Amino acid sequence: MLPQTALLLLMSLNLVHGVFYTERYQTPTGIKGPPSNTKTQFFIPYAIKGKGVSLRGEQGIPGPPGPAGPRGHPGPSGPPGKPGTGSPGPQGQPGLPGPPGPSATGKPGLPGLPGKQGERGLNGPKGDIGPAGLPGPRGPPGPPGIPGPAGISVPGKPGPQGPTGEPGPRGFPGEKGTSGVPGLNGQKGEMGHCTPCRPGERGLPGPQGPTGPPGPPGVGKRGENGLPGQPGLKGDQGVPGERGAAGPSGPQGPPGEQGPEGIGKPGAPGIPGQPGIPGMKGQPGAPGTAGLPGAPGFGKPGLPGLKGQRGPVGLPGSPGAKGEQGPAGHPGEAGLPGPSGNMGPQGPKGIPGNPGLPGPKGEMGPVGPAGNPGAKGERGSSGLDGKPGYPGEPGLNGPKGNPGLPGPKGDPGIAGSPGLPGPVGPAGAKGVPGHNGEAGPRGVPGIPGTRGPIGPPGIPGFPGSKGDVGTPGPPGPAGIAVKGLNGPTGPPGPPGPRGNAGEPGLPGPPGPPGPPGQVALPEDFVKAGQRPFVSANQGVTGMPVSAFTVILSKAYPAIGTPIPFDKILYNKQQHYDPRTGIFTCKIPGIYYFSYHIHVKGTHAWVGLYKNGTPVMYTYDEYIKGYLDQASGSAVIDLTENDQVWLQLPNAGSNGLYSPEYVHSSFSGFLVAPM
């Protein structure tokens, strides 16, 4: 019923106006997206024309809007409209909650984002003390710290006495002492009475008999030639000898070949002759021909002319060829400060500068709790062998050893007739020394036999029991000096009296460099009555000193080895070796090292090494036609026998340049001992 009523209303409007207003219902515009699927939209796809005569009259006044008709049935859905471009509408109110759906076990969802950090809760009650934790693993070494400020030098308390040093090398043997005066013979005792008498104990050895007269000279065979001796030292140049007398002239030699034709020299001018008699005046001669033009004359310089007017400015000349780079000039005097220029634009961010000087020392913080003992660190690698030390001073002479125990005296043997010398037999066991027999008559000297081969050494005998101390005997003949085994070092004896000065020996080889001398101080530097001792290894404040500055005298050193800076400006402590280019630490502490190099020809890459490990690198990219500079510095802690040097690690970047007047240098000094 409702659709029919709407259709009749539309037909009546068409009859009045003659034209049917075609209305198309479109989807709402302004919202992007797919066409709406609502079922309330419809459209009429064709126009309905009225029947009869259409009279077009004037348009009347639009009437008031009629009452809204009842809601019609939803028409069929029209075709989708063009997508709109409107702005999204306001968000609708949330709909009523739908009925609960059937429950089903869903898949676990993705983990949600972490929530916001909650507020800090109240502190809980203090828990019981837990068990002590195990020491954690040893952490990696931290970066080297910034050097602290120079401390105030205060003389410290004397440290405890160090351990006793190792015993020094055995000293030279002392001079042989003089033999003691033999004692007086005691009084002869009374004759003893005994029945049957036991043989008495062995008496003391008697004094050595007087030396017999020398025998006739023996006839021995000529010995073998000895080994050639060592070449003697070169003697001093002798005094030039006197000039010898002239020798007699030799016989006349054969005539020589004819020499080339000589060119005679003009002789000396002759003595002028006496003036002749003046002659008669002759007839005037015919005029001669014109002579040759004379030599150009040299007139005296005339007076300087007036100053001429300034000429026009000449054209600029063509640029000359590029000259060779001259040597670096001496730094000129500082010029007058120029006027301040206008504020320029902000430049690009510069390279970060070197770390600044350390700030003032902060106040001492509270002492923290004692930490747990850390795990024992791994043993470090053994350092490089140090240079051999200088020879120590000779030790004091040890005390003279006790005299050896005299062996038991052997029984006297029966003197036999002298036999022919036989071959040398094997050495027998050592016999008991016999009593000194009475001097027999001198026998006929025998013929000296040939020298036999050296026999094998005998079996050493058992040590005898200690006998009584014998009376000092007369000095024996001088023995053969053989160096014995070094005995244990005895305690130092008291210094002996000064001996007589010996004869001057041969000049020895040059010794190692001696310790540096003392530093002289000006008179006004020292207070009255005070003379502080300052050595090369100790500064004015009493702290130890270790410093050096060296220069490289040759450009382009070798690759992969320490750079030998061989020209020394300061190296009194001898801690830097100019032959190897290595600085060896003798005083453990904190050191400061710096280097300044010039670069020419190619790039330069320099490394500062400590015990074979690079500490830092410096690189300079060379620009052709320029002389570049590069520098670097570092603070390093060193222990004894640590070594530091500079090295070129790459063969492609070896442009280290150091000629005669453009120096590359390397310096280092001790900041604070540890």
Curated annotation (Swiss-Prot):
Residues 1-18 form the signal peptide. It comes from the Eukaryota. Residues 106-116, 277-293, 303-312, 393-403, 441-453 have a biased composition (Low complexity). Residues 19-56 are annotated as: Nonhelical region (NC2). Residues 57-519 are annotated as: Triple-helical region. It is found in: Secreted, Extracellular space, Extracellular matrix. GO terms for molecular function: metal ion binding. PROSITE patterns: C1Q. Ca(2+) 2 binds at D628. GO terms for cellular component: collagen trimer; extracellular region. Residues 137-147, 207-217, 506-516 have a biased composition (Pro residues). InterPro entries: C1q_dom (IPR001073), Collagen (IPR008160), Collagen/C1q_domain (IPR050392), Tumour_necrosis_fac-like_dom (IPR008983). The modification 4-hydroxyproline is found at P460, P463. Gene3D superfamilies: 2.60.120.40. Homotrimer. Type X collagen is a product of hypertrophic chondrocytes and has been localized to presumptive mineralization zones of hyaline cartilage. This is Collagen alpha-1(X) chain. The lineage of its organism: Eukaryota, Metazoa, Chordata, Craniata, Vertebrata.
